Regions:
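N-terminal carbohydrate-binding accessory modules
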Residues: 5, 20-74, 104, 110
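Substrate-binding/catalytic cleft of secreted carbohydrate-active enzymes
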Residues: 24, 115, 119-152, 160-297
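Aromatic-lined substrate-binding rim segments of carbohydrate-active enzymes
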Residues: 60-126, 198-209
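N-terminal secretory signal peptides that target proteins for export/translocation
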Residues: 1-2
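Conserved residues at the C-terminal ends of beta-strands
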Residues: 49-51, 78, 181, 301
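Carbohydrate-binding surfaces of carbohydrate-active enzymes
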Residues: 153-164, 171-179, 190-194, 207, ...
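Bacterial N-terminal signal peptides
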Residues: 7-17
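Aromatic- and acidic-residue-enriched carbohydrate-binding clefts of CAZyme catalytic domains
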Residues: 41, 78-90, 95, 123-148, ...
Length: 359
């Protein structure tokens, strides 16, 4: 009996010690001078943009594995408000909508996550992710400090925080960055609104991770907040140095990141499938990696916009196809493409001594 008690005491001690060590050994991510820092060491984000809503849940794990085998170290994803709150006050984060499960799957394969909760996300999605029922209030002004709009955004952000804030890196999860709004400079100029969205993101629980805002290089300064990281969006064929020129002038010590490097483009009904040359995409990524510039490849896998969730463009009304193939490295059906092979061969060169998983 005495030996058993001693054994149990020793077992409890080692379990307690192991828990303490696990807590003290948690990873860290921060924004340093000229570089991101992961566990205190320079880190280049190589992110794959994928959307959980456009991939049937049984295939989530496969697509994440494909991104890992490509050579990516991070997943980037939007949170689509209107699919989680299809009716006012009724939230659904189960099944296909279980974003926490998606992030945990990414962590299973050693991948970090960048979350982009909007509230507006664009993404060629119905109303840019904003719920239809907001328009029942006839005088509402979307993406402004409209009291009703901001009230509903706050409620939504709190629900997202319940799901994802526990998964921040500082909490033992894998979320390293969270975006505030989305390309707002192409919509308007309203720093008070952006500031309010930032505050809602923080109060929803995302107060242990880096916050950032993204925009095109031509207008990112219109709403840029001093306390947020700034990133720029551009696509295949762009002049890398020119895209970052203004940002480097304003913030010479900031880490550089292309938060959306467009691998292809979206398709409209009645038009030809959009494509972009694989060699141009790969060259653009090489140019960034040679400069230690982080990137998120939008899209790495586009998938399918199921149901009636496809959006449309204005002022010349033009609807999106249900296919969101995007001419991405991983095809709509989840297949390897020539883009995938070329990019994988490139990324191997920037991970000396690391063997990529088999495809």
């Amino acid at each position: 009996m005495r030996n058993r008690i001693i054994f149990l005491l020793l077992l409890s001690f080692f379990i307690f010690r192991g828990n303490i060590q696990a807590q003290t050994q948690r990873e860290t991510f921060s924004v340093g001078d000229h570089t991101f820092l992961l566990n205190g060491k320079p880190f280049v984000i190589k992110a794959a943009e994928v959307h959980y809503t456009r991939i049937p849940r049984p295939y989530w794990e496969h697509r994440i594995q494909m991104c890992k085998a490509l050579g990516m170290n991070t997943l980037c994803l939007y949170v689509f408000w209107n699919i989680h709150e299809q009716h006012e006050g009724e939230f659904n984060f189960n099944g296909q909508n279980d974003i926490a499960a998606f992030c945990k799957l990414a962590q299973k394969y050693g991948m970090y996550v960048i979350v982009r909760p909007g509230p507006y996300v664009c993404a060629e999605w119905e109303m840019g992710g904003l719920p239809w029922w907001l328009l029942k209030k006839k005088d509402i002004k979307l993406r402004t400090l409209d009291p009703y709009f901001m009230k509903r955004v706050g409620i939504f952000m709190n629900e997202v925080g319940k799901q994802l804030a526990p998964l921040q890196l500082a909490n033992g999860g894998n979320i390293i960055m969270v975006q505030v709004e989305n390309e707002y400079g192409s919509y308007g100029t309203d720093k008070p609104y952006i500031s309010a969205i930032r505050d809602l993101v923080k109060t929803s629980g995302f107060n242990k991770t880096a916050l950032f805002q993204c925009d095109w290089s031509s207008n990112f300064t219109h709403n840029a907040l001093d306390d947020l990281l700034w990133t720029v969006n551009f696509g295949t064929g762009a002049n890398i140095d020119e895209q970052f020129k203004k940002l480097k002038e304003l913030r010479p010590n900031t880490p550089l990141m292309c938060s959306e490097f467009w691998s292809g483009w979206f398709d409209h009904w009645g038009r030809k499938h959009e494509t972009r040359p694989a060699k141009d995409m790969v060259q653009g990524i090489k140019d960034m990696l040679d400069r230690n510039i982080s990137f998120s490849l939008y899209m790495t896998h586009g998938g399918t916009t199921f149901g009636w969730w496809g959006g449309a463009n204005n002022p010349a009304y033009s609807t999106m196809c249900s296919s969101y193939d995007y001419d991405a490295p991983i095809s709509e059906a989840g297949w390897v493409t020539p883009k995938y092979t070329l990019l994988r061969d490139l990324l191997k060169q920037y991970e000396p001594g690391y063997k990529l998983p088999e495809i």
